[in-house]
């Protein structure tokens, strides 16, 4: 059995200034908020989505597949972040997340597709893609906090992430309900 060295190779550059730390933290909170909103916004939109895409018997998978794929990807994204850097993984995660959101908005627009089937199956597959990106967002955010701040400061910043998630839990269903009144596609940003 071999062990791997998971220590992060820091560049010889100067450590980030307090202003750079604040800016980075605010950007991470925005990313975290969008990912957390995505988990909660869909709950109030599901009745409309099911009516549009006709998949009552499998509607629970729309939420489940996102949570499943994002959770499974956490250790993978974490290791990749250790190997290739947090910024690269965060940008890759944002790209996958946004691409998955765009695809979710298109689910069912082209009828039954040979590999992806009906609109509801398409939505489930695309939510899985979105979850893969979402896992990178959560992982990169918490790992970057560990990189930026001393151990005694980390709990405070992790707690602020918890507050952002609480805010998303309250705002998500409200925003989802608002967008549902204007059509289901808008919750995915298309």
Regions of interest found by a model, annotated:
Residues 2, 8-190:
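Transmembrane-helix bundle of Major Facilitator Superfamily
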